[in-house]
A protein has these predicted regions:
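Non-Sec secretion/translocation targeting segments of pathogen effectors
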Residues: 1-3, 13, 293, 298, ...
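Ankyrin repeat structural motif
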Residues: 4, 43, 78-84, 109-120, ...
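Charged, low-complexity interaction regions
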Residues: 17-19, 287
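Ankyrin repeat arrays, specifically the small/polar loop and inter-repeat linker segments at the C-terminal end
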Residues: 19, 56-57, 88-96, 122-132, ...
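Ankyrin-repeat boundary/"N-cap" motif
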Residues: 25-27, 63-69, 94-104, 131-144, ...
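Amphipathic alpha-helical elements of HEAT/ARM-like alpha-solenoid repeat scaffolds that form extended
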Residues: 29, 33, 112-116, 183, ...
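Ankyrin repeat A-helix N-terminal signature
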Residues: 71-72, 102-109, 142-148, 185-189, ...
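Leucine-rich solenoid repeat scaffolds
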Residues: 254-275, 285, 293-298
């Protein structure tokens, strides 16, 4: 179904809350605006955004704004967002608050956000990133989604770190959704990108790796990709204490990442990599003897080495 461009003009000109919609197949009389908007197709430029006036934007109710904004965000071109922000802000300095509350957080891409930020105050930028949807997911969770992570996540990280303070960035990156996932645990690829991006901040990477302790798991439990382990070990190579803590983290069943992967048998490669790293930390790192023994015992590895270390105390 294709909608004629006249529909948008009808919406603007309508004095009530109902419009007539004429499609190639039929004519629909007296449809509520929300219903009329359903005839819009994402790949069609049915809205003439350049003709949007600030008066309309400030009179529209929240449902109309949501339809308008999300229709714009669903498109590849960014001109629509530019026009909405410029026209709206011209008479309403608090337009960002309305926009933040109206948008579907799964829609905006990094290029959309870049444009919006030019029209926002710092506190509004923080509010934008802190907002979550019904699944408790924010913009960074959605940017890490499997369908977008390759093209959007790293760019979104650039924008996030450019606009917010270090403490605010950490808060956003450690925000959990309803399932306990932070942005870096949405996909294996997101985990690799996030750890590489923050490699100069190993303390934050360590926090991301243990972020689900209250849910009984973490990135190293969930992953099926050896590259996730390799990146974690690389970033934390000079932080043996933090890495040991991560490798001693237990889920609700009392399993560490190593014993979990050993029991599940999903990946022998991951199990072997974990065993190798645990052993290396225990015998060839700056861990104390007590920490080394605890690391081996909780992972049920090499009791003979643990006994040897015990006699060295």
């Amino acid at each position: 179904i294709k909608v004629k461009e006249a529909l948008y003009n009808q919406i603007l000109e309508s004095k009530g809350d109902k419009v007539n919609v004429e499609t190639s197949d039929a004519t629909y009389l007296g449809l509520p605006i929300a219903e009329a908007a359903k005839f819009f197709t994402p790949d069609e430029k049915n809205f003439d955004f350049e003709k949007l006036d600030a008066d309309y934007l400030n009179k529209a109710d929240s449902d109309e704004l949501q339809i308008l904004l999300n229709s714009a965000f669903s498109r590849e071109e960014v001109d629509a967002i530019q026009d909405i922000c410029r026209n709206w802000r011209s008479v309403n300095k608090r337009f960002a608050g309305e926009m933040i509350s109206a948008i579907d957080l799964s829609r905006p891409k990094s290029q959309h956000i870049d444009i919006m930020l030019h029209y926002m105050q710092p506190n509004e930028v923080k509010e934008l990133y802190e907002r979550t949807d019904s699944e408790m997911q924010g913009l960074m969770h959605h940017a890490a989604n499997a369908s977008r992570v390759k093209d959007d996540f790293r760019t979104s990280l650039d924008t996030l770190t450019h606009c917010l303070s270090g403490d605010d960035v950490e808060e956003i990156m450690l925000t959990k959704d309803i399932r306990g996932n932070i942005p870096a645990t949405i996909t294996d690829e997101a985990a690799i990108i996030a750890m590489d991006y923050f490699k100069e901040n190993p303390e934050l990477v360590a926090k991301m790796l243990v972020n689900r302790e209250d849910f009984g798991a973490g990135i190293l439990f969930d992953t099926s990709e050896i590259k996730v382990l390799e990146k974690a070990f690389e970033v934390l190579k000079n932080n043996p204490d933090e890495l040991a803590d991560i490798l001693m983290l237990c889920n609700a069943n009392g399993d560490t990442a190593y014993t979990y992967h050993k029991e599940m048998g999903h990946s022998k490669e991951i199990k072997n990599a974990l065993e190798e790293k645990i052993t290396e930390l225990a015998v060839d790192s700056d861990l104390s003897v007590k920490e080394s023994i605890s690391l081996l015992e909780i992972n049920e590895l090499h009791p003979q080495i643990a006994n040897y270390l015990r006699y060295q105390k």
